[in-house]
Regions:
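Multi-pass membrane glycosyltransferase architecture that uses lipid-linked
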Residues: 2-217
Length: 217
């Protein structure tokens, strides 16, 4: 394939755009995330509250949600959040104070999410969105802040949501619904997309199949 053909297909074909642009894009994003982690000040307030909220189960053996709280208020996130951030607390020195390893983990989550989003677009092949727009995936300053400076649970929830979307695009209904359930367990606002998921299941496998798939998930 000549260079002119590649350029033409980059403008018209999502699969070609993902094949040629995704790897350099993710590499550049990892370099940018590294610079941000090393040069920008970490935002402690949300992370500190998260660590306080999971301190009860980890340190005191308290699993009663009514007693779990941080400096920003009571714990409002589902059980998957508690398990995830308890694990991240261990990664952060056991008490949540050594944040740098966690920032690298979140940078990896960011890269994986970019890859999944690009994969979903390649499978969907939207006709009204030009393939070169994959370059705009990394244009948000706020996303970089959320992923490597604030360490929000949204990052993990969206990773699992886009994994679910990718699996559903490939017709892997049970695995897709399982990934979707895990996303909901980390942040419940993922449930806002549940009506769309239900419609897809009804169209693909019918009412009985949708019930069977939901039981597996």
């Amino acid at each position: 394939m000549t260079s002119s053909m590649i350029i033409r297909r980059l403008a018209t074909d999502w699969s070609t755009a993902v094949r040629y642009l995704l790897a350099p894009l993710i590499f550049g994003e990892m370099l940018l995330c590294t610079i941000i982690v090393l040069k920008r000040s970490f935002t402690h307030i949300d992370w500190r509250a998260y660590m306080q909220e999971v301190e009860g189960p980890m340190v005191h053996g308290v699993w009663d949600y009514a007693q779990l709280r941080g400096e920003t208020g009571p714990l409002v996130y589902p059980g998957g959040f508690v398990v995830l951030y308890a694990s991240l607390r261990l990664l952060a020195g056991g008490d949540g104070t050594v944040v740098r390893p966690v920032q690298w983990a979140f940078a990896g989550v960011y890269a994986a999410t970019l890859g999944l989003v690009a994969g979903c677009y390649a499978l969907a092949r939207p006709t009204r969105v030009p393939p070169w727009s994959i370059l705009l995936f990394c244009a948000s300053l706020r996303l970089h802040s959320i992923y490597v400076l604030r360490l929000f649970n949204d990052c993990w929830a969206m990773l699992l949501f886009w994994l679910a979307t990718y699996l559903l695009c490939r017709g892997r209904w049970k695995l897709g619904c399982a990934a979707y359930s895990l996303a909901v367990s980390i942040k419940a606002n993922v449930l806002l997309t549940a009506p769309g998921l239900l419609l897809l299941l009804l169209q693909a496998v019918g009412p009985r199949g949708a019930v069977a798939v939901s039981h597996v998930a």
